[in-house]
Amino acid sequence: MNDKILEGVMASRVPTSLTKEELELDEQPLTRTPSPQPVTAWVRYGETAVKVDGLLVAWTPRAVAVRWETPGGEHRAWLWSSATRPR
């Protein structure tokens, strides 16, 4: 998919984030960092998967919270930790 199409997808949709049930925040410890870490992450916008460069801002043993810039502004989502890699 070309960059213009991906930009349109990110500008017109919200990213898919893990649900409260998937996060299990009442059972799993949550860590927030004062120094966000650069990552590359696979994010879903509906059925469209997009690879983004973002910042890891929080995590649990299985999930990570990532934020990234899009043409429409900043987006955030909780993702499975396996969907991210350090940059």
Task: Label the model's feature ranges.
Residues 3-81:
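Basic/aromatic-rich interaction segments and small domains that mediate binding to polyanionic partners
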